[in-house]
Amino acid sequence: MSTYNKNRPQTIQIMFNSIAKQYDRTNAVLSFCLHRRWNLELVKKVQSQQTSHTLLDLCAGTGDVAFSYLNQVSAPCQAYLVDFSSEMLACAEEKAKSFGKTPHSFQYVLADVQRLPFSNQTMDCATMAYGIRNIHHPLQSLQETYRVLKPGGCLGILELTRPENKFLQIGHQLYLKTLLPLLGKWLTANENAYQYLRKSIHTFIPPGELEELVKTAGFINTGRYSLAGGIATIITGFKPMK
């Protein structure tokens, strides 16, 4: 049984710090590289068409989503990468060097997404990938995101979910219970982290309830998009103009 528990956030912080350097390689192996396609789908749904804008990437990890976003836009973008794992942000900062000369700028913010250190109505769009199921109070993080988004701003959430198809459920559960922990142990020497991952997916609310939570936080015109038969889901929503 995993010793990590989202009701004890410091244990989750320790977990992500411990696997940060192996995180990208592990994600690629465990998702069969599908996560890159999913990240791009998320980016396409929230991409701003403004000439200059701000991106708030929550639970940013090593920056995959933020950098995928910036690769898709040519207009200057100020990207704020927020995570409570200092090791994850250090990996993101190192990865950003590969951009070389770019019109974009980056800021790395060590913070809890339930208490964002930004003023009201300062961000144009926000993303959160593979993070919300790890948050102790997910509604609070959504309300904070709503607070800092400008009117008309878009939120996009990408999360690992449970497929609805019964046959897919069987294969999914088998993978999570057997192969996932073994691969996680082999790649990171931290089997506990991937036991936690299995449990967090299994116990998290279904996509429909997550969409309702986004609405409860105040977002409108929400959308829900199933990926790979439901093993991942994108939820989008907009802050009203008034």
Curated annotation (Swiss-Prot):
The EC code for this enzyme is: 2.1.1.163
Q: Which keywords annotate this record? A: Menaquinone biosynthesis, Methyltransferase, S-adenosyl-L-methionine, Transferase
What this protein catalyses is: a 2-demethylmenaquinol + S-adenosyl-L-methionine = a menaquinol + S-adenosyl-L-homocysteine + H(+)
Q: Which InterPro entries match?
A: SAM-dependent_MTases_sf (IPR029063), UbiE/COQ5_MeTrFase (IPR004033), UbiE/COQ5_MeTrFase_CS (IPR023576)
Pathway(s) it belongs to: Quinol/quinone metabolism; menaquinone biosynthesis; menaquinol from 1,4-dihydroxy-2-naphthoate: step 2/2
Positions of S-adenosyl-L-methionine binding: T62, D83, D112, V113
Q: Which GO terms describe its molecular function?
A: demethylmenaquinone methyltransferase activity
Q: Does the keyword Methyltransferase apply?
A: yes
Gene Ontology biological process: menaquinone biosynthetic process; methylation
Q: List the HAMAP family hit by this protein, alphabetically.
A: MenG_UbiE_methyltr (MF_01813)
PANTHER family with a match to the protein in the record: 2-METHOXY-6-POLYPRENYL-1,4-BENZOQUINOL METHYLASE, MITOCHONDRIAL, METHYLTRANSFERASE
| Family designation | Belongs to the class I-like SAM-binding methyltransferase superfamily. MenG/UbiE family.
NCBIfam families recorded for this chain? MenG_MenH_UbiE, PRK00216.1-5
Q: What does this protein do?
A: Methyltransferase required for the conversion of demethylmenaquinol (DMKH2) to menaquinol (MKH2).
Under which name does UniProt file this protein? Answer: Demethylmenaquinone methyltransferase
Organism encoding this protein:
Protochlamydia amoebophila (strain UWE25)
Q: Which gene encodes it?
A: menG
